[in-house]
Amino acid sequence: MGVNAVHWFRKGLRLHDNPALRECIRGADTVRCVYILDPWFAGSSNVGINRWRFLLQCLEDLDANLRKLNSRLFVIRGQPADVFPRLFKEWSIAKLSIEYDSEPFGKERDAAIKKLASEAGVEVIVRISHTLYDLDKIIELNGGQPPLTYKRFQTLISRMEPLEMPVETITPEVMQKCTTPVSDDHDEKYGVPSLEELGFDTDGLPSAVWPGGETEALTRLERHLERKAWVANFERPRMNANSLLASPTGLSPYLRFGCLSCRLFYFKLTDLYKKVKKNSSPPLSLYGQLLWREFFYTAATNNPRFDKMEGNPICVQIPWDKNPEALAKWAEGRTGFPWIDAIMTQLRQEGWIHHLARHAVACFLTRGDLWISWEEGMKVFEELLLDADWSVNAGSWMWLSCSSFFQQFFHCYCPVGFGRRTDPNGDYIRRYLPVLRGFPAKYIYDPWNAPESVQKAAKCVIGVNYPKPMVNHAEASRLNIERMKQIYQQLSRYRGLGLLATVPSNPNGNGNGGLMSFSPGESISGCSSAGGAQLGTGDGQTVGVQTCALGDSHTGGSGVQQQGYCQASSILRYAHGDNQQSHLMQPGRASLGTGISAGKRPNPEEETQSVGPKVQRQSTN
């Protein structure tokens, strides 16, 4: 009797650099590649039509590539725990291979399947290929906890073994005598479903700006490396209006679904750098966005509450407002701020926005203007973004809302000035908000300031054809910066809580090839700052707020740990008005000083005015 094997695709929807699939094929007589799709999940999950379309296109491309190997993809309806016991028996399976999933939900699911496989006498092969590193080894190297600063993360990976090279693509030679049993009714039983079959209405659905699949991903990778003149000099290009549009060299959705191997991208960049720079060793900054992705994966892997505020040991408990009406206006692009509304319109239509556009709308929703929880924004991105990734999406929203990691809370993106500096003519606004097309560049970012005659000439009266601004940005941002200031003053006065960590500069490209939901550590013009103050370390490095968990080995602390983090235990009072808001934050033994020095006062046209007097130098002892 021959050896029958199954490879279970989840992410990693590719034939190149797929070590689990290669290992599965070795020694097998038959192999079936399966993807398990839960139709109920399709109808009830918080995932929009663009992302589902991208996934189905990935599956269609994978099936087409498997056909070239005289194989097929088996798309099976159901839930893994129900499907596999049947498949093990029906197909007489001897071994099952999977790509390692680092997310808490994925680890729990895979543990259940491994148990079922063991009971059925099925060998399970697991290989790491969705991340560059073994995340557990990074955590082990850090004393059993994930590093909570990017600088610490960089230090740890510099001590790791060199990365393994991508494995050979699956070819007919790799398959050798391994075959795939395919029945005549395969398409009927195991074909890739359509959007209509999943319950989506496709009437009026425009063509995909981002076609899914490994074939497209590899084409884009070559374009990405060829087109980027900046790669030759390894300089970051300046942001401009064209950067805001989807690029044929963008890679982020393909990395998220695993159509493109992060290791292949890493080594292609390395080879190019060495070719241009005559074999000199590339700096870590070359891989900036790949490493930020890895950083958030590491932070999230042992924290099932990573996407929540409550019960999340690394998240500051901030009393966000609950305002469903304001949230809906933001999500639907009806804020009355053209820059924000154009971004949200592009996101809903195309499933992608530039990483700095993500900064702008996230800041506006949370600490900038609306004071609505980052969790709500994260859910909208999860629905609409093609590259929405559980770990990176949640980590980025916590970071940008000043809820965790590092951030200069006194910086606030201006919803008028930031866009105007990026695209002075307003072409981006006209593209996604045609109702404003008739406005001259002078008023297109703040049309409410246009004289009535200009509004009528543009055939768009503010308050009638396009909404008035939903908030007064200057007032809202002042209030919210003050709120954040009070929260962090309370935290910094609390003995035993380390708050500051240096944030290295991060080369992010022009965003079109960006790999992340956000790109932390970037200083952008068009942001306001409170008090004209800049945090500094004295060595020229930027400083942001960092919540250090108890027992974090690089703070010198120690204590009780739970799933790699400390247990939250201390109540902090939020000093705003009546001082009655309670905040839960974990203590740490080490206390870090806060150095603050005066900085340049912002331009009042482009940025919100400073808030109150300059902050004086403080320290906690």
UniProtKB/Swiss-Prot annotation:
A motif (LIR 8) lies at residues 379-384. Expressed in the pineal gland. One of its GO terms (biological process) is circadian regulation of gene expression. The keyword Flavoprotein applies. GO terms for molecular function: DNA binding; FAD binding; photoreceptor activity. A motif (LIR 13) lies at residues 492-497. A motif (LIR 9) lies at residues 395-400. A motif (LIR 11) lies at residues 430-435. InterPro entries: Crypto/Photolyase_FAD-like_sf, Crypto/Photolyase_N_sf, Cryptochr/Photolyase_FAD-bd, Cryptochrome/DNA_photolyase_1, DNA_photolyase_N, Rossmann-like_a/b/a_fold. Pfam families: DNA_photolyase (PF00875), FAD_binding_7 (PF03441). A motif (LIR 6) lies at residues 285-290. Binds 1 FAD per subunit. Only a minority of the protein molecules contain bound FAD. Contrary to the situation in photolyases, the FAD is bound in a shallow, surface-exposed pocket. A motif (LIR 1) lies at residues 50-54. GO terms for cellular component: cytoplasm; cytosol; nucleus; photoreceptor disc membrane; photoreceptor outer segment membrane. Residues 581-621 are annotated as: Disordered. A motif (LIR 2) lies at residues 82-87. A motif (LIR 3) lies at residues 151-156. Its main location: cytoplasm. Its cofactor is FAD; (6R)-5,10-methylene-5,6,7,8-tetrahydrofolate. Belongs to the DNA photolyase class-1 family. This is Cryptochrome-1. It comes from Gallus gallus. The lineage of its organism: Eukaryota, Metazoa, Chordata, Craniata, Vertebrata. The gene is CRY1.
